């Protein structure tokens, strides 16, 4: 077997490679020997040194050959990088100048925007000729104006739903509310200001606390108004009865003053219990029929002149109302009985007068001589 075959297979091809020049060999090759011996422990001590020399020389040659190539490759990269760094400064795009419109031009654009927010090409060209700019700038202005309108419309609900905002204090020292606040908060402030302190709800308590003394008075007024409406029915009855012979003066409690003609039955019936404020007038004598009719008519026309309305205190309880209503009904029944007795008494008086007159006439006719007729006496 040849010497080459005794070598390790890893270094067989390395032995065939011709040796390179000696100027590439390092000055201190001995420091790599222990490492090479550890890599190939089965190799004889004479040949491995030569093979390791050759391998090491080849590796060093490859490293040296790669270093200049890397250095040469890095130079153009650095040049390119330098060009890239210096390029943007030199070739930077200039920013477009913003077109500034005058007041007249803005007014003209605003008028056209209110008429048509998205003009077509012909309208944009016409506007560009009028204003003196390009059609592209007109298109850009309309686009920005539409975006501004959309922004305003999107911000509108947020302003309405926001809470109350306050501006700095005014010269008088009070807070000036901002009109951008929500309507609920404005209404709440209006409620707190308009109501008196007794009716203003407390912020700490969930329920509203009111003064009971202020509530009782409206309740009493309401009860009195209901009683006044209910008591109109008996009052109307009394007014209808007052058209008949008799005197009546009405007030809030219904039938108050009854002026009756003299009769024994009326005196007995009038001795019934009559509530306070309801009194019978004294009997002044038997008036005639014409006087009765005139007096009743005048009382119906002007009841306040004959009997002024008394001032009644507000009712405090519904039981008092029921008691007053029952007393009013009793007085009305008494008045109806009095009127019925008056009618009956008048009818009996008429009958008696007629009977007496017929009796006197018959007596005078019988006593008078022949050829003479005596006239009946006039009724007193």
UniProtKB/Swiss-Prot annotation:
Tissue: Specifically expressed in early embryos.
Biased composition (Polar residues): 43-53, 278-302, 351-380
Compositional bias ranges of the Low complexity kind: 260-271
MF terms in GO: DNA binding
Biased composition (Basic and acidic residues): 54-67, 234-250
GO biological-process terms attached to the record: maternal-to-zygotic transition of gene expression; meiosis I/meiosis II transition; negative regulation of meiotic nuclear division; negative regulation of oocyte maturation; oocyte maturation; regulation of transcription by RNA polymerase II; stem cell differentiation
Keyword DNA damage found: no
InterPro entries noted in UniProt: HD (IPR001356), Homeodomain-like_sf (IPR009057)
Alphabetic keyword roster: Developmental protein, DNA-binding, Homeobox, Nucleus, Transcription, Transcription regulation
Location(s) in or outside the cell: Nucleus
Residue range(s) of DNA binding per entry: 94-153
SMART domains reported for this sequence: HOX (SM00389)
Nucleus recorded as keyword: yes
Pfam families given in the database record: Homeodomain
Domain of life where this protein originates: Eukaryota
Span list, region Disordered: 1-25, 43-95, 152-182, 234-303, 339-380
Record-linked PROSITE patterns: HOMEOBOX_2
Family: Belongs to the paired homeobox family. Obox subfamily.
Physiological role: Transcription factor required for zygotic genome activation (ZGA), a critical event in early embryonic development during which the developmental control passes from maternally provided mRNAs to the expression of the zygotic genome after fertilization. Cannot compensate for loss of other members of the Obox family, suggesting that its function differs from other Obox family members. May regulate expression of histone genes in embryonic stem cells. Also involved in completion of meiosis of oocytes during the meiosis-I/meiosis-II transition.
Name the UniProt record assigns to this protein: Oocyte-specific homeobox protein 4
């Amino acid at each position: 077997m040849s010497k080459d075959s005794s070598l390790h297979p890893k270094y067989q091809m390395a032995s065939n490679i011709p040796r390179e020049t000696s100027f590439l060999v390092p000055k201190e090759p001995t420091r790599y020997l222990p490492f090479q011996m550890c890599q190939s422990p089965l190799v004889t001590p004479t040949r491995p040194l030569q093979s390791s020399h050759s391998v090491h020389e080849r590796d060093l040659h490859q490293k040296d050959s790669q270093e200049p190539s890397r250095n040469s490759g890095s130079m153009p990269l650095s040049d390119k990088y330098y060009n890239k760094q210096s390029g943007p400064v030199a070739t930077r795009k200039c920013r477009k100048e913003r077109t500034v419109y005058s007041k007249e031009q803005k007014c003209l654009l605003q008028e056209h925007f209110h008429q048509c927010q998205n003009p077509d090409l012909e309208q944009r060209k016409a506007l560009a000729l009028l204003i003196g700019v390009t059609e592209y700038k007109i298109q850009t202005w309309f686009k920005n104006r539409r975006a501004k309108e959309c922004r305003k419309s999107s911000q509108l609900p947020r302003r309405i739903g926001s809470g109350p905002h306050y501006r700095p204090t005014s010269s008088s020292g009070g807070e000036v509310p901002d009109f951008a606040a929500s309507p609920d908060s404005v209404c709440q402030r209006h409620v707190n200001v308009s109501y008196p302190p007794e009716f203003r709800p407390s912020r700490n308590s969930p329920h509203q606390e009111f003064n009971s003394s202020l509530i009782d008075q409206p309740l009493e007024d309401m009860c009195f108004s209901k009683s006044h409406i209910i008591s109109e029915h008996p009052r109307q009855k009394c007014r209808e009865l007052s058209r008949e012979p008799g005197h009546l003066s009405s007030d809030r409690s219904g039938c108050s003053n009854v002026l009756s003609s003299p009769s024994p039955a009326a005196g007995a019936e009038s001795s019934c219990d009559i509530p306070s404020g309801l009194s019978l007038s004294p009997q002044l004598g038997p008036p005639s029929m014409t006087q009765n009719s005139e007096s009743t008519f005048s009382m119906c026309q002007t009841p306040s002149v004959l009997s002024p309305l008394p001032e009644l205190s507000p009712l405090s309880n519904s039981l008092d109302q029921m008691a007053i209503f029952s007393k009013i009904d009793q007085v009305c029944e008494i008045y109806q009985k009095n009127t019925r007795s008056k009618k009956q008494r008048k009818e009996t008086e008429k009958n008696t007068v007629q009977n007496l007159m017929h009796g006197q006439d018959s007596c005078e006719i019988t006593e008078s001589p022949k050829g003479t007729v005596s006239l009946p006496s006039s009724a007193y």
